[in-house]
Amino acid sequence: MNANPKFLAATAEVDAAAVAPLPKSRKVYETGSRPDIRVPFREISQDDTPTMFGGERNPPLTVYDTSGPYTDPDVRIDIRQGLPALRKAWIEERGDTELLAGPTSEYGKSRLTDPKLTAMRFDLQRPPRRAKAGANVSQMHYARRGIVTPEMEFVAIRENLRREQYLETLRASGPDGEKLARRLQRQHPGQSFGAAIPTIITPEFVRDEVARGRAIIPANINHPEVEPMAIGRNFLVKINANIGNSAVSSGIGEEVEKMTWAIRWGGDTVMDLSTGKHIHETREWIVRNSPVPIGTVPIYQALEKVDGKAEELTWEIFRDTLIEQAEQGVDYFTIHAGVRLPFIPMTADRMTGIVSRGGSIMAKWCLAHHKESFLYERFEEICEIMKAYDVSFSLGDGLRPGSGYDANDEAQFAELKTLGELTQVAWKHDVQVMIEGPGHVPMQMIKENMELQLEHCHEAPFYTLGPLTTDIAPGYDHITSGIGAALIGWYGTAMLCYVTPKEHLGLPNKKDVKDGIITYKIAAHAADLAKGHPGAAIRDNALSKARFEFRWDDQFNLGLDPDTAKEFHDETLPKDSMKVAHFCSMCGPHFCSMKITQDVRDYAASQGVAEQEALQKGMQEKAVEFVKKGAEIYHQT
């Protein structure tokens, strides 16, 4: 089906699971230089450490939060109304945009006036906005003029994760607070491969990174609901979640539900890859209810407009589609402008040919007309559209390898060089750019991808799908790709596109979305640790401390997926009393290494000696006991 026949705008409601509070967590905000810059975080409370000396306080830990207002109990969520337009004042006060009378794309107009769509249409009351004649409204344009926008300040506060406040709270937590702060912020030196990540992210640093093209802030002026975020090598590694219906599966309600589910678990951006009949309406519902940037592949919808016949695509249809989606508020477009006619023969000897949907569409068009791609030839005209709405480019890798066999071949790298050339064209227009990457790449070949991308694309952010490191595990490609994602994230990729267990097999459901998100949150965080991102180890250290102290609930809640952690624990130790037990089901009460170590520490404290001395003393006592019992290894019982 193309849209759920039961979906009606009048009865649409938020997924209850998306607004349920996470365990022992609360939404907190940090206010910037003006009261309407309120940056959201999730604060996880912890139990005190149970010690023989009366307990040690473990202050709440702040973590990055992508869930938007959905997890704020003070905000009433009604998806029929959409989210609050938090950037509205920022956009208006710049004075470089104007409200339109309504949609200006032909397709947008036709959908708005089609009475058959009334029952499912999102009832948007405000008209779209566009740059005034001659104006450029991109964050890169402001950055290059030396302007620090509220969006840039928002990003800076968000990236710092209230780390300094947390450390100050640790220092003030008790007599050993200073020692505790030192322990919890301890971090192994990283290898950043040239990334220059400051200890404190300032708004000026964000501005400079955006001006240089090393970072982007995807934030369409028609998506005022978005909470600004940055994608760049010198920021936290981000992840994207793909959703979208098809001609045979899912509908509007399910896709909005997937979006809210994805951001609950940590999706930094969401791509709507819908290919069904009601693409326009589905996208409107998603954008109006999304606090994270939304990306699309406009060629998919353009293809639907010509009944799936790639050879019938025209520049005029594609241009109208870009304007339609820009006026809805899409924050970044994947555009496969690097798929050029001369490159197509390079794929002839591949094992898996051209696997990108967008790439194959444009390859077919080029061959049908024996002409250069209109995306390539009209690229400057595309830039004019992008800068009028501040839509960022995600330059698509239409010739990415679809198997390890095809990795790092001539076609892939020819396209990459072209994407670098197009990046400089876009930057001439002050349009923000990131570069898409593979794909399927064996581990030993991954680093070359990152090095060549930095060289050819002038440090524009890299955004990769995995890469998958082996092709033998259908049903487990979230794992095969998570391995590659962690590696390429370490080498410098700015955003990782998740892969779900359903990759190559079918469209993901909610469970698949969550599995993909958690896998990629692990990969992104592992990359941050390996790069030596300041403060990246604090959460690891806090969880390790909770684990050693047998604070089971804190172990669950500090993790990426508290629900699953608690579920696994409860399968073998279900009683509440087991949440304070000093062992788990793996080793049991008598063989727990952490319990034994804790016993040594307690013994040392009671004897007034150091831990090493306590170990020696304990072993001497046991030796005497062994001799007294007859020096026999085994005894009759």
Swiss-Prot record:
Residues involved in Zn(2+) binding: 440, 504
Residues that, per the record, bind substrate: 242, 271, 300, 336, 356-358, 397-400, 436, 463
Gene Ontology annotations of biological process type: thiamine biosynthetic process; thiamine diphosphate biosynthetic process
One Pfam family, short name: ThiC-associated
Cofactor entry: [4Fe-4S] cluster
Catalyses which reaction(s): 5-amino-1-(5-phospho-beta-D-ribosyl)imidazole + S-adenosyl-L-methionine = 4-amino-2-methyl-5-(phosphooxymethyl)pyrimidine + CO + 5'-deoxyadenosine + formate + L-methionine + 3 H(+)
Superkingdom of this protein's organism: Bacteria
One term under GO cellular component: cytosol
Cofactor, free-text remark: Binds 1 [4Fe-4S] cluster per subunit. The cluster is coordinated with 3 cysteines and an exchangeable S-adenosyl-L-methionine.
Record carries keyword Cytoplasm: no
Enzyme Commission designation: 4.1.99.17
GO molecular function, one term: 4 iron, 4 sulfur cluster binding
InterPro entries from the UniProt entry: ThiC (IPR037509), ThiC-associated_dom (IPR025747), ThiC/Bza_core_dom (IPR038521), ThiC/BzaA/B (IPR002817)
Binding site for [4Fe-4S] cluster: 584, 587, 592
Pathway the protein acts in: Cofactor biosynthesis; thiamine diphosphate biosynthesis
Record key words, sorted: 4Fe-4S, Iron, Iron-sulfur, Lyase, Metal-binding, S-adenosyl-L-methionine, Thiamine biosynthesis, Zinc
Task performed by this protein: Catalyzes the synthesis of the hydroxymethylpyrimidine phosphate (HMP-P) moiety of thiamine from aminoimidazole ribotide (AIR) in a radical S-adenosyl-L-methionine (SAM)-dependent reaction.
Family the UniProt entry places it in: Belongs to the ThiC family.
PANTHER family named among the record's database cross-references: PHOSPHOMETHYLPYRIMIDINE SYNTHASE, CHLOROPLASTIC (PTHR30557:SF1), THIAMINE BIOSYNTHESIS PROTEIN THIC (PTHR30557)
Record HAMAP family: ThiC
Subunit architecture: Homodimer.
Protein name, entry field: Phosphomethylpyrimidine synthase
Organism, as annotated: Bordetella petrii (strain ATCC BAA-461 / DSM 12804 / CCUG 43448)
Upper taxonomic lineage: Bacteria, Pseudomonadati, Pseudomonadota, Betaproteobacteria, Burkholderiales
